[in-house]
Amino acid sequence: MTLSGCGGNSASDAKSASGAATVKVMVGGLDKVIYLPAMLTQRLGYFKAEGLDVELLTEPAGVQAETALISGDVQGAVGFYDHTLDLQVKGKKVESVVQFSHAPGEVEVVSNRAAGSIASPKDFKGKKLGVTGLGSSTDFLTKYLAVRDGVKTSEFTPVAVGAGQTFIAALKQGSIEGGMTTDPTVATLVDQKLGKVLIDMRTPEGSQEALGGPYPSSSLYMNADWVDSHKQTVQKLVNALVKTLRWMSAHSPEEIAAKMPADYAQGGKALYAQSIRSTLPMFTKDGVMPENGPETVEKVLKAFNPNLKSAKVDLSRTFTTEFVKKVPQG
């Protein structure tokens, strides 16, 4: 299925063999619990029920999903909402059409080796800290936590280590002393006694404490022009994803885990279910942007991002609730 996000080739023109509209979506790590609604929607058959043939592709970092969207390789990206602000300042019109979460789902961990010397972000000075990729949301949030606690972004080194096994290997080898990651990586490294949790942003309370408000993170975001010219397709995508968020709110972590591909539970079924349990509080039940969420994200990004510091961001153009408000009830 080759489909370009710009030009004449579009989801409304492209049909799969079954006659369903074809949409390509790049996910910043399909096996990350923070992006779980994407694959779960596929597994529950909700995309198909809406008459869509959705191809889910994966990249280890959200920033790579953003790149695929901007280049027109895909029509949608599942990644952090904060990319929409960053892109607007760079002259790109991108908007979140459904918001999966109201907290980052991220955790700052420290290796056992470094635990004695890192008690808070004040101690980031001189340290090597893992992020999924440079320019990724983990990079953004690490920089914010440092700046908030009086450490300049030039005083520590962010290291791109991805997530999962590559993150764990970097921690084991000592090439990073800590870093920001999500479940199931967090559950695995704690279970293997390789490190401990320093800052937990998997819940709205954790987001409030670390960032001063709700931090809408994982979302489906798309080029605004594409959204405007494919409203029917976007509505179907949003219907399917919101149906999944509702399903998640009514089922146990074990029931959710059982629906996912078996290879996502690399640390075993029980540990995978535990990682879902830890991250579940971050998800919305309706896909609606949380109140004050965009403002929190703007405040966080402006604290350290020179591109955004003095820029005027039109937050109303970074997301839309047009589609989530039209999702059928029940």
Spans of model-derived segments:
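Conserved C-terminal helix/tail region of periplasmic/extracytoplasmic solute-binding proteins
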Residues: 295-330
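Short, glycine-/small- and polar/acidic-enriched structural segments
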Residues: 9, 13-161, 175-183, 198-199
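C-terminal motif of bacterial Sec signal peptides marking the signal peptidase cleavage site
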Residues: 2-5
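Secondary-structure end/capping motifs
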Residues: 227-308
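Pocket-lining segment of extracytoplasmic ligand-binding domains
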Residues: 166-261
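Extracytoplasmic/secreted envelope proteins and their assembly/folding machinery
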Residues: 35-38, 44, 66, 81-84, ...
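Short, solvent-exposed loop/beta-turn-alpha elements that line the ligand-binding surface or hinge
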Residues: 49, 116, 120, 202-213, ...
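Soluble non-cytosolic domains of exported or imported proteins
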Residues: 32, 59-63, 132, 136-137, ...
